[in-house]
């Protein structure tokens, strides 16, 4: 049985809408995938509701962001079959959503200054599924505007 236990969708910083992941997994020969988006329960809820889509087992998961105080850096913890109604888990996801959006909005403001054709609204359009603006959404908006010729990433980020 082949599986991928760490897949992201457009519910976080992935490039593929969650509805398409099972069919892509089936075409590549996978029997199961864990939908493990960053700090959101949307993908776990989807997996619980669509267990055997396209003959691929959807495993509910979430990738939680934390901090290792001993080593002083961020860590990620994969949590499988989370309780999507757990108040503490929901609160963690809400806090991370707020933090990510604040950080991304600051980056979006800087991009608007550098590239007048770039708008924060366009970046938000790329993240409708999650309501969280990830760096990948900013990059996708830049790509839609033809601003990713290879040099922007190294210079701006």
Segments (PLM) and residue ranges:
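Extended substrate/RNA-proximal surfaces in nucleic-acid metabolism proteins
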Residues: 53-157
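An N-terminally biased module of ancient metal coordination in phosphate/nucleic-acid-related enzymes
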Residues: 1-72
């Amino acid at each position: 049985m082949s599986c991928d236990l760490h897949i992201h969708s457009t519910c976080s910083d992935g490039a593929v809408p969650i509805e398409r992941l099972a069919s892509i997994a089936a075409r590549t020969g996978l029997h199961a995938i864990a939908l493990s988006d960053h700090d959101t329960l949307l993908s776990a809820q989807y997996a619980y509701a669509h267990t055997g889509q396209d003959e691929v087992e959807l495993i509910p998961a979430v990738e939680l962001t934390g901090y290792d105080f001993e080593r002083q850096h961020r860590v990620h913890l994969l949590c499988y079959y989370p309780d999507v109604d757990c108040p503490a888990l929901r609160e963690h996801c809400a806090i991370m959503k707020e933090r990510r959006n604040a950080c991304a909005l600051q980056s979006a403001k800087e991009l608007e200054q550098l590239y007048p054709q770039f708008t924060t609204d366009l970046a938000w359009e790329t993240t409708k599924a999650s309501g969280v603006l990830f760096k990948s959404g900013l990059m996708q908006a830049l790509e839609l505007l033809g601003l990713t010729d290879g040099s922007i990433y190294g210079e701006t980020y």
